[in-house]
Amino acid sequence: MFFRPDFRPRCAKWLIATGLFLMLGACVEKPTTLERVKEDGVLRMITRNSPATYFQDRNGETGFEYELVKRFADDLGVELKIETADNLDDLFDQMNKPGGPVLGAAGLIETPKRKQQARFSHSYLEVTPQVVYRNGQSRPTDPGDLVGKRIVVLKGSAHAEQLAALKAQNPGLEYEESDAVEVVDLLRMVDEGQIDLTLVDSNELAMNQVYFPNVRVAFDLGEAREQRWVVAPGEDNSLLNEINAYLDKVEKNGTLQRLKDRYYGHVDVLGYVGAYTFAQHLQERLPKYEKHFQTSAKKEQVDWRLLAAIGYQESMWQPAVTSKTGVRGLMMLTQNTAQAMGVTNRLDARQSIQGGAKYFAYVKDQLDDSIKEPDRTWLALASYNIGSGHLEDARKLAQNEGLNPDKWLDVKKMLPRLAQKKWYSKTRYGYARGGEPVHFVANIRRYYDILTWVTQPQLEGSQVADGNLHVPGVDKTQPPAPPAPASGSSPDKPAL
């Protein structure tokens, strides 16, 4: 008789252990979207390539959407990886693919169709859809006037959905959707008369209209709407909740408003005449002095385009001008400032630019270390214009009002008070034309934006000096352009 070991108890134990292991494994939750982002150390974002969202210039990546998302990624402690969509439909398609981007930030409006494609965050920017037409053509005043016009909009856009709804009420309305263009292209097509009308959001029009002097607003199509970020519908709520908490935080602490001011706070200072004039001067005058701007800017560690923007605000790039207050030359230097900067001939363009660059660098260096960029540049420009003493008076007024004296957004609210006795009587340096530096800075920021945009496609060399200037969509009409300078250097500008 042979002994046969009974394996049944042992098998039973093995089966029980295996079952428990499988049950425990089933109970382990897979990482949430937010946890996955943090574990990977990367936040994948998809956006559009445009001035209002994301683009690259000589200084690297920039754009309103980019900066807002970059700060969010920094808050999470992860790297931001950016992908650009070919068009709006592509953006949603990419987000809905397995392993696709987890965040979409492209100035998106929540619509019934899009709610099926993604989930939307809290809002961060209010915009108004606007019908635009070419100056000189018959101006539409209501939706009925759109019938019989050639209209092109971005394919898959909220504007296309608006027009589809209007068509139900106006059967004669026809429009085209294009996936081969961006907003800049649509505005160019209107500007050049290739199409009759297009529909764009107010923020993108404000940022781009300077490049297209012939474009005009016909009317607002509907109420203001809110832009939001999106996450893919298949994701859990963890990332969306974190996004909403972040957007609420930057709204409350003023970060969002400062970003809005940085990108949109100065875009409406230009008019048609100023735009047309700057366009001409950009091509006819700047090439003569561009090398001087670049050389002096490099020596003083200043962006040459910012220096050129200052020069345009001061003299419209004219080396022989003299104001009634005695400031002279392309950079409109006072006699005392010129002497302090080593300028022997203020009417010599090269010397004037060198002196202006040196003076601006000096003024910027004198600011408190607590002032960080980009506010440091804007406050330095204000000081360059009105004088460091008056700027300090405005900063103290801001502090007394519970505002931040290191932020241009707050200080610019106080500067006009320097012209009111109620306020300047309490300051150390007294009366000043405080409204001037506000306009001075706004104009320069706009000129600088334009110079940055028109030079960014070509990272080496100069498009201006080489005669290859390309202002998006303006080659057949006129280049970009802000208004003629409101004034020259303030007589309140101190000598060193």
From Swiss-Prot:
GO terms for cellular component: cell outer membrane. Residues 1-29 form the signal peptide. It catalyses: Exolytic cleavage of the (1->4)-beta-glycosidic linkage between N-acetylmuramic acid (MurNAc) and N-acetylglucosamine (GlcNAc) residues in peptidoglycan, from either the reducing or the non-reducing ends of the peptidoglycan chains, with concomitant formation of a 1,6-anhydrobond in the MurNAc residue. Its EC number is 4.2.2.n1. GO terms for biological process: cell wall macromolecule catabolic process; cell wall organization; peptidoglycan catabolic process. It comes from the Bacteria. The active site is at 314. Keywords: Cell outer membrane, Cell wall biogenesis/degradation, Lyase, Membrane, Signal. Residues 30-267 are annotated as: Non-LT domain. One of its GO terms (molecular function) is peptidoglycan lytic transglycosylase activity. It is found in: Cell outer membrane. Residues 464-496 are annotated as: Disordered. Transmembrane segments: none annotated. The keyword Lyase applies. It is a peripheral membrane protein. Residues 268-496 are annotated as: LT domain. Residues 486-496 have a biased composition (Low complexity). It is an enzyme of class 4 (lyase). Murein-degrading enzyme that degrades murein glycan strands and insoluble, high-molecular weight murein sacculi, with the concomitant formation of a 1,6-anhydromuramoyl product. Lytic transglycosylases (LTs) play an integral role in the metabolism of the peptidoglycan (PG) sacculus. Their lytic action creates space within the PG sacculus to allow for its expansion as well as for the insertion of various structures such as secretion systems and flagella. The N-terminal domain does not have lytic activity and probably modulates enzymatic activity. The C-terminal domain is the catalytic active domain. In the N-terminal section; belongs to the bacterial solute-binding protein 3 family. This is Membrane-bound lytic murein transglycosylase F. It comes from Pseudomonas savastanoi pv. phaseolicola (strain 1448A / Race 6).
